[in-house]
From Swiss-Prot:
Name of the protein in question: DNA-directed RNA polymerase subunit beta'
CDD domains: RNAP_beta'_C, RNAP_beta'_N
Source domain of life: Bacteria
Keyword Transcription carried by entry: yes
Length: 1690
């Protein structure tokens, strides 16, 4: 026989950051090409994204080229195509990889909040992004121009910016001037005057050239000078009018210098003496002086010494005007030694008198249009410009141009530039000391170049992902950890810097602990997921549709290949940078193609397809409803299922359902086939024949089908599956037609009706699954709801009306006397005969003999009642009762309690059959005439309108305000509506058989509110509103909050039978539409609430029978704002006692006199027990005097004090064993005592107990009386008090099980009224129990057409949300400079911190109300009340610790701080609020479900002082972990001495670092060093508390100094936060914020121990609950041979 057993294979799952080597190890090869498949052959391209060599063959067991085909070649690698022969399934598993040409940062670690990279490197995220994406920094700074480079590598005129200048200045000596940047120079340069041009050039201080264009307008005087004259002035010299230009001089005659002949040139006025041909002399030329006469003739011979000219006198030339001397261009002069000039030939000397002159400096590079000496007119162009735009001028140059061109150009002293930035990745320690720079500092590229010039090869900086990688590689985590810990010790714990450091320290510790290397956050290799997870499919028309991922991978590969090529070519840095940035963006898009709208800091553009749809990245594949977690891992499609419309199956038993034949054949096809084949041959031909038998629906097939489904069960499910009763098992019955038939009684749990609802059918396949479905899920065994322990599968509508009709009587029945009754019968059978013969009717009064509790009695009743009672268990029969909905429900519940689930199920079937039959017999119809309008109605309306008229008159006269007028009118109409409702009900009740009255009164359909609208009055209507508006003021009317601002003060005074007018119809539309809108808007919200609840509680299962705790919670009535939300009997039901319940008077264990049951610890309380305990009250003495015998070995079983002094103990001391010992020492054997029997009991009178004066409350309802209160009672002369026992019950809130809860603390499994089984998934049940009504309530519109006063579900849901998300509704608002916490509803409630009395309520000098509380000791505590809050207490009232003194919302963390560590007071307050919201909607949910959720919300604690644990202050840690850590610390402290001996001689596994008093890090020992006694002593002196040593090739940690335990505070988390802080990362990631949860878990190397249910569903194994528990794992299920054959075929 085949066996099957369910062993759980996976114990835990760890997540870590993948190293490049790990990614490569996953891979089947590198993807080098972006191609996917060949467009002609449709085969994958080699080395492409679908390559068969990398990812596996496309065809099963066939290589790409077809050389190897078939399974026999499995594992062979084809030498031709390189493809390994294997199953095509490999393409779902095998991965590839892309080797990146440049590293790229993993965006999750950059963009997470807080950023992991930013925290670890202590860098700003914006700076990090700038580095990674090769960004720049905007710098506004001055510039300088080098004027004297001295011995530096600068050139004169080089521009240096301020940042660089500061760097160079520290090391080099050179001169600079500040630079000015030219802006908007006007051009061209125009002459302002007429005149002559003079051009001059000169060099500036920066070595650049300036051309001076000088334009002069001059008066010029010409003076001729003659040869021989001596000019006494210099060119350019200033002279005065009349000043000599040449001096007067006598000119000697000229003589021949040698023999020869003369030549006279009259034109040039010269005499040339030429020597004789025989002579060696050269010819000599003489200029004839002005005024001399030539004495020789042309050609004349002369002798040496002959006179050639006469002597003469040259007169002086005088200046005719004042001005500047200018030598003419024709003037030929010779400079003399005395500085004068001799005129060699006639010429001109000019004197220029400047009338006007303009200078135009022009910078080098400008085009000059004029030449020297040119004459220009005013307005002529001199040059194209004088300066260039953006030209840098030194301050000297700037002054020149500023003085010559004022207002013709602007300058900027500072320049604004975007400078590329780099991060320092390595720096010489000396340079670091000198410059103050360190690794990780960001500088601009200019600064880096400056540092490089000064410190060549001593500083390295870079940008991009490679820079981040270097920084991460350079981190020494151990050293960083020691540094951070040392720095934290110096800072105040609450400072923001300390918080930042703590966050960083946690990350460092996480990296150390997990063994992850920080540089792995920068990718060198990108994994390529298997191709079958990113398929490409051919669509109509031959085109291909591909997954977005392929497009993202393609883009990445293209950019990667392009960058690699550019690197090989040695492309310029700027091109490479751009390409690297694009590669980084491609990797980003692949991992997370996110957008800013998702709350990310992303500066990236989102990649979109041609239709503008963002491409789905790997992150999108994981997160959200359609992500991998929620869609594929937590929700799976199920085979062997069908779906069809449901119809009612009145003939079915409760555990049966009707399945259409066709559907059943399809569902059970493999089983039918197996059965058919089991009878004959299994050959292929035979198989085809048998298949044809099924497909052609031959008679044999139906016979086999009938046989197959016998004994099987199927699961029926109706969406939405809100709780476990939405899936139940039924025995299938084959039916004709196409609809599934459903038993009408199981409609309520499914929330099904027959207006077109559909249901799904599932077939459990294995014998184990069938057994589980039958015994655990059969509808017969799921009648009782696990939410409240009462029946949920109940008769409705027709069945109710049938039963009601059967048991109702005429209105005269009760007044009818026995003697007046005509029909008398000796037995029910006789009566039935009379009925069938037509003598009597169902409702005819009869006298009949029936058996009641074994006795024959004659009773007055009707045949209908006899018929109905005949189906009931004998001791539950009641012949004088009308059985309406409530009565039938109570009957089913009582039957279940007394006789068990089977009898209850049978009763339901019987009631169903009876109900349907007699509903048909009743012939129920509905007509207008059945709507009876009360005759008094018109008179009442007339009277009311008159009153309204008087109110309006008073308003118009000014006697009433607008608010008062509205309030009065609303109150008036509310009263009238109520009065007419009562009258309508009475009018209908006159005829007990009125169809409408029967429907409403029986509870079958509708309610009196609807009848009131049909036949009475519609009443006031409500307006639409925002339920969270702060403006809503509500008033209480008959226990109901009425929002006056939201109510029309004009009523609809008509009813629907007579019809409404247009205005009234219009008014009605508001509320009617509001109902529809609320339903639509809030359904999703309620679903989200359920989802959060499930996520929080899913791991809570019953893990052990008893945790052994003695803690518990006090049983009480839950009272909120004076309204009883839950009575104590409901509170007690299903609980287990935490301690014995003692009789208040005798102090002995309480016993139920009826059942004899004793209420000791660990007793489970049933309904009857709860009722008994809740009603048990006694009058007990406050004080009793007695004399006790102290020779007995027991003390009184109540609080007692000595009534006489004993030794050193005074009168009034509590009686203890120490007092008894002292008395015995004195030789006493009896002591007088005063006993207080009331101490330890609970005050049970709902009216407070006052003091003698009647001013102060001494006791309030449900107060536990302690000795202080007892003495107060005694002082005030109170002798007896009505009390009840103090009952402490166990609760999930106080359970001490490490994981989940124990069976004793959970108590009763409400679905079967037995103690809960170990393994029960109580968390899921709790979440479903709370969430299901929330969803249901939104889907039913509770507003009856928007009529005022109907309960409003939205406000209920808001309350639920406020309770489960306590901090989401807190708003810190600044008002008047102060921070105030406000809510949607008012302000913060003031909490009382002591037990005491309200002494006084007064107003202080600022006008604020102050409440003074006097405690028991007489101390006064003052509470100032916020302006918006209203006082809830009154003078003399008793208040207890944790009570609210004012209106407003409770700030939960304040309440938590008021109480003990348990958080019970907080939970009970939350419970009151939330129960109230549900109770108002008529929904019953047991408290334990809320307690489980609150337990999870209170499961985290805030670390105040981490002691010597690895936690950080302000870190949220599971309470379980803290308690475990503290336990381990205390155990470790006990082993310190032993450990010190043990470590001697062992080798250190890590180096040991500590910090000195100066703040320097010191290495105490190196890795591998042996631990000696001296070294150990050194460790202890340095305060090292634990060391890691190597022991048998393992690293073991030993504690060598005592550690401090953790100090903490309990914290209340919201549902969302509790779900995200769940210890298992798989469940948290599947909930919300997937990327961040996975990021944080990977850094930590988090291990998910698979404790919860979700995690196990995700990994695909049985959940650790129910039959999935390890206890059941070894059970082997034997299956029948038939089932085995079916299994094989299936």
């Amino acid at each position: 026989m085949p066996m099957s057993s369910f062993k759980r294979k996976i114990k835990a799952i760890q997540i870590k950051i993948a190293s490049p080597d790990v990614i490569r190890s996953w891979s089947g090869g590198e993807v080098k090409k972006p191609e996917t498949i060949n467009y002609r052959t449709f085969k994958p391209e080699r080395d492409g994204l679908f390559c068969e060599r990398i990812f596996g063959p496309v065809k099963d067991y066939e290589c790409a080229c077809g050389k190897y085909k078939g399974k026999k070649y499995e594992g062979t690698v084809c030498e031709r195509c390189g493809v390994r022969v294997e199953s095509r399934e490999a393409r779902r598993k095998r991965m590839g990889h892309i080797e990146l040409a440049a590293p790229a940062v993993h965006i999750w670690y950059l963009e997470s909040i807080p950023s992991v990279l930013g925290t670890l490197l202590n860098m700003n995220v914006s700076d990090l992004e700038n580095i990674i994406y090769y960004g720049s920094r905007r710098v506004i700074e001055r510039a300088f121009i080098v004027t004297d480079p001295k011995d530096t590598p600068f050139a004169q005129g080089d521009i240096i910016y301020e940042t660089e200048y500061r760097i160079y200045r520290k090391k080099w000596d050179f001169e600079v001037e500040q630079a000015f940047i030219v802006k908007n120079p006007r051009s061209p340069v125009l002459s302002d005057i007429d005149g002559e041009v003079i051009l001059r050039t000169e060099k500036t201080v920066t070595g650049r050239e300036i051309t001076w264009i000088i334009v002069r307008n001059v008066n010029r005087a010409e003076h001729t000078v003659l040869p021989g004259m001596i000019i006494t002035v210099k060119d350019g010299q200033e002279v005065e009018k009349g000043q000599d230009l040449t001096r007067e001089m006598n000119v000697d005659p000229l003589y021949a210098p040698f023999d020869g002949h003369v030549e006279i040139d009259e034109i040039s006025n010269t005499i040339t003496v030429k020597p004789l041909t025989t002579s060696k002399d050269q010819p000599v030329v003489f200029t004839v002086p002005y005024g001399a006469r030539v004495l020789v003739s042309n050609g004349q011979k002369v002798k040496k010494g002959d006179q050639l000219t006469t002597s003469t006198t040259l007169p002086a030339v005088k200046a005719s005007i004042s001005g500047r001397v200018k030598f003419g261009s024709n003037l030929n002069v010779r400079a003399l030694e005395d500085g004068n000039f001799e005129v060699l030939s006639s010429g001109n000397v000019y004197i220029e008198q400047v009338i006007e002159e303009r200078k135009y400096p022009v910078f080098e590079g400008a085009l000059v249009y004029v030449n020297n000496g040119d004459q220009v007119k005013k307005g002529d162009h001199l040059a194209d410009r004088f300066l260039f735009e953006e030209e840098y001028l030194s301050s000297t140059e700037y002054k020149i141009f500023e003085s010559h061109y004022p207002t013709m150009f602007d300058v900027e002293e500072r320049t604004e530039n975007d400078r590329p930035i780099v991060v320092i990745t390595d720096i010489d320690p000396e340079v670091s000391k000198e410059t103050g720079l360190k690794m990780g500092d960001i500088i601009t590229e200019n600064e880096y170049e400056a540092y490089l010039q000064i410190y060549p090869e001593k500083i390295v900086a870079d940008a991009g992902a490679q820079a981040i990688k270097k920084l991460l590689q350079n981190l020494d985590l151990e050293e960083l950890r020691a540094e951070l810990e040392a720095e934290l010790k110096k800072l105040p714990a609450s400072s923001s810097k300390a918080m930042k450091l703590r966050r960083r320290l946690k990350m460092v510790k996480d990296f150390i602990k997990s063994g992850n290397k920080p540089e792995w956050m920068v990718l060198e290799v990108v994994p390529v997921i298997p191709p079958d997870l990113r398929p490409m499919i051919q669509i109509e028309g031959g085109r291909f549709a591909t997954t977005d991922l392929n497009e993202l991978y393609r883009r990445l590969i293209n950019r990667n290949n392009r960058l690699r090529k550019l690197l090989e070519l040695g492309a310029p840095e700027i091109i490479l940078r751009n390409e690297k940035r694009m590669l980084q963006e491609a990797v980003d898009a692949l991992i997370h193609n996110g957008s800013d709208s998702e709350g990310k800091r992303s500066r990236r553009a989102v990649l979109k397809d041609r239709n503008g749809r963002p491409l789905k990245s790997l992150t999108d594949l994981l997160k959200g409803k359609k992500g991998r977690f929620r869609r594929n891992l937590l929700g799976k499609r199920v085979d062997y299922s069908g779906r069809a419309v449901i119809v009612v199956g009145p003939h079915l038993k409760i555990h049966q359902c009707g399945i259409p034949k066709k559907m059943a054949m399809e569902l059970f096809k493999p089983f039918v086939l197996a059965k058919l084949l089991g009878e004959g041959s299994t050959s292929k031909t035979m198989r085809k024949v048998k298949k044809a038998i099924i497909e052609k629906e031959m008679p044999e097939a139906w016979e086999v089908l009938e046989e197959v489904i016998k004994g099987s069960v199927v699961l029926l499910n109706r969406a939405p599956t809100l709780h476990r009763m939405s899936i139940q098992a039924f025995e299938p019955k084959l039916v004709e037609g196409n609809a599934i038939q459903l038993h009408p009684v199981v409609c309520p749990p499914f929330n099904a009706d027959f207006d077109g609802d559909q249901m799904a059918v599932h077939v459990p396949l294995s014998a184990a699954a069938q057994a589980e479905a039958r015994f655990l899920m059969l509808s017969r065994y799921n009648i009782i709801s696990p939410a409240h322990g009462k029946p949920i599968s109940l008769p409705t509508q027709d069945i109710i009306i049938g039963s009601y009709y059967l048991t109702t009587v005429g209105k005269d029945f009760d007044s009818l006397k026995e003697e007046d009754i005509r029909w008398r019968f000796s037995s029910p059978e006789e009566a039935m005969l009379a009925y069938h013969l037509g003598y009597i009717k169902l409702h005819t009064p009869i006298l009949i003999k029936v058996s009641i509790k074994g006795e024959e009695k004659r009773i007055k009743t009707t045949l209908g009642r006899v018929i109905f009672n005949s189906i009931l268990p004998e001791d539950l029969r009641d012949y004088n009762r009308i059985f309406d909905k409530k009565q039938i429900n109570a009957l089913v519940y009582e039957t279940f309690k007394r006789y068990g689930i089977d009898r209850a199920a049978d009763l339901l079937d019987d009631v169903k059959d009876l109900g349907f039959h007699y509903a048909t017999v009743s012939g129920l119809t509905l007509s207008l005439k059945d709507l009876k309008i009360p005759p008094e109605r018109d008179e009442i309306l007339k009277r009311t309108w008159e009153k309204v008229r008087i109110i309006e008159e008073n308003y118009e006269r000014g006697f009433l305000t607008e608010e008062q007028r509205k309030s009065e009118i609303i109150r008036l109409w509310m009263n009238v509506t109520e009065e007419i409702t009562e009258l309508t009900s009475k009018t209908l009740a006159e005829d007990p058989f009125n169809p409408i009255y029967m429907m409403v009164n029986s509870g079958a359909r509708g309610n009196i509110d609807q009848v009131k609208q049909l036949a009475g009055i519609r009443g006031l209507m409500i307006k639409a509103y925002d339920p969270r508006s702060r403006e809503i003021k509500s008033k209480i009317f008959k226990g109901q909050a009425i929002h006056e601002a939201l109510t029309f003060d004009y009523p609809v005074d008509k009813n629907l039978r007579e019809g409404v007018d247009i205005l009234q119809f219009f008014i009605s539309t508001y509320g009617a539409r509001k109902g529809q809108v609320d339903t639509a808007m809030n359904t999703s919200f309620a679903g989200y609430l359920t989802r959060r609840l499930v996520d929080v509680a899913q791991s809570v299962t019953v893990t052990e029978p008893d945790c052994g705790t003695h803690e518990g919670i006090r049983a009480m009535d839950l009272i909120k704002d004076g309204t009883v939300v839950e009575k104590m009997n409901e509170f007690l039901f299903g609980r287990v006692l935490a301690s014995d319940v003692l009789d208040p008077e005798t102090k002995e264990v309480l016993k139920n006199p009826e059942t004899g049951k004793e209420y000791t610890r660990n007793t489970m309380l049933t309904d009857d027990d709860a009722n008994f305990l809740a009603s048990y009250k006694k009058m007990v003495d406050v004080v009793k005097y007695d004399e006790i015998d102290i020779t007995e070995l027991s003390l009184p079983n109540m609080y007692a004090e000595i009534a006489e002094p004993v030794g050193e103990y005074k009168e009034g001391t509590e009686l203890t064993w120490d007092v008894v010992k002292a008395a015995r020492n004195e030789g006493k054997y009896r002591i007088k005592v005063k006993m207080y029997p009331v101490v330890g009991t609970v005050y049970a009178n709902e009216q407070p107990l006052y003091d003698k004066k009647g001013e102060r409350e001494l006791l309030v309802y449900q107060e536990v009386i302690n000795e202080v209160v007892a003495k107060l009672l005694e002082e005030n002369g109170v002798e007896k008090v009505l009390v009840r026992p103090d009952i402490i019950v166990r609760s999930p809130l106080t359970c001490e099980s490490e994981y989940g809860v124990c069976a004793a603390c959970y108590g009763m499994d409400l679905s079967n009224h037995k103690i809960v089984n170990v393994g029960e998934a109580v968390g899921i049940v709790a979440a479903q129990s709370i969430g299901e009504p929330g969803t249901q309530l939104t889907m039913r519109t509770f507003h009856v057409g928007g009529v005022m006063g109907a309960s409003d579900i939205v406000s209920g849901l808001t309350t639920v949300e406020k309770t489960f998300e306590p901090y989401a509704f807190l708003r810190e608002e600044k008002s008047g400079g102060k921070k105030e916490i406000r809510k949607y509803y008012g302000s913060e409630a003031v909490l009382c911190e002591v037990d005491g009395f309200v002494k006084d309520i007064a107003t202080d000098e600022t006008g604020r109300t102050v409440i003074y509380i006097e405690d028991y000791a007489g101390g006064i505590h003052a509470y100032r009340i916020p302006k918006r809050a209203k006082v809830k207490v009154k003078k003399g009232q008793k208040v207890l610790r944790g009570d609210t003194l004012t209106t407003g919302a409770i700030v939960w963390w304040k309440l938590l701080e008021l109480e003990s560590e348990k958080g019970v007071l907080t939970a009970m307050n939350l419970l009151k609020i939330i129960k109230n919201a549900y109770v108002q909607q008529g929904v019953s949910i047991h408290d334990k479900h809320f307690e489980i959720i609150f337990r999870q919300m209170l499961s985290m604690a805030l670390v105040i002082d981490p002691g010597d644990s690895d936690y950080l202050p302000d870190q949220l840690v599971p309470l379980v972990d803290i308690k475990r850590t503290n336990r381990e610390i205390l155990e470790g402290n006990a082993r310190v001495e032993e450990n010190r001996k043990w470590v001697i001689g062992k080798m250190l596994a890590k180096r040991v670092i500590t910090e000195t008093d100066d703040g320097e890090l010191v290495e105490l020992a190196q890795k591998g060093e042996e631990v000696t006694e001296e070294l150990l002593k050194k460790f202890i002196e340095a305060g090292i508390k634990e060391i890691d040593v190597v022991e048998k090739d393992r690293v073991v940690t030993y504690q060598i100094l005592p550690k401090e335990p953790i100090k903490y505070k309990r914290r209340l988390l919201s549902l969302k936060k509790a779900a995200l802080n769940y210890p298992g990362w798989l469940s948290a990631a599947a909930f919300e914020e997937t990327a961040w949860v996975l990021t944080a878990a990977a850094i930590e190397g988090k291990v998910d121990p698979l404790i919860g249910l979700k995690e196990n569903v995700i990994v695909g194994q049985l959940i650790p609950a129910g039959t999935g528990l390890d206890v059941f794992a070894g059970i082997q299920v034997e299956e029948t041979p038939r089932a085995a054959a079916e299994e094989k075929l299936a």
